[in-house]
Structure formats: structure tokens, C-alpha cells
Amino acid sequence: MAEVRLGENESIESALRRFKKKIQKAGILSEVKRRERYEKPSLRRKRKQEAARKRNR
């Protein structure tokens, strides 16, 4: 889990910016969006195969 500690003279806005960057790098937001709805295993395999094809081009 991403954790950000507020520095002595640090504003909340800058700490929030750092937190958002950490979450983006960790891929937490994209995973949450992906898990919003159930994905059938066959569709999951299909999506992974398409992603692999795009990477190998």
C-alpha cells in the first residue's frame, strides 16, 4: 500500500501530489478500474493475448 508522510513544512497539496504519483507507479488505480466488474476467464485470456500481440509488434 502506498504511504506518504507529511513533512514538517510540506503542504497537503504537495503530499497529495506525491501520493497520487506513488499510486500511479504502483498501478493501484488501473487495477481497481479493471476489477470494477467481473471478467469471464475466457475474456481475460483474450485480453492478455491481445496485449501480448501489441507488445511484440
UniProtKB/Swiss-Prot annotation:
PROSITE patterns listed in its UniProt record: RIBOSOMAL_S21 (PS01181)
Any one GO biological process: translation
A Pfam family: Ribosomal_S21
Gene Ontology molecular function, alphabetical: structural constituent of ribosome
DNA repair listed as a keyword: no
Domain of life: Bacteria
NCBIfam families: S21p
Family: Belongs to the bacterial ribosomal protein bS21 family.
Name listed for the protein in its UniProt record: Small ribosomal subunit protein bS21
Source species: Thermosynechococcus vestitus (strain NIES-2133 / IAM M-273 / BP-1)
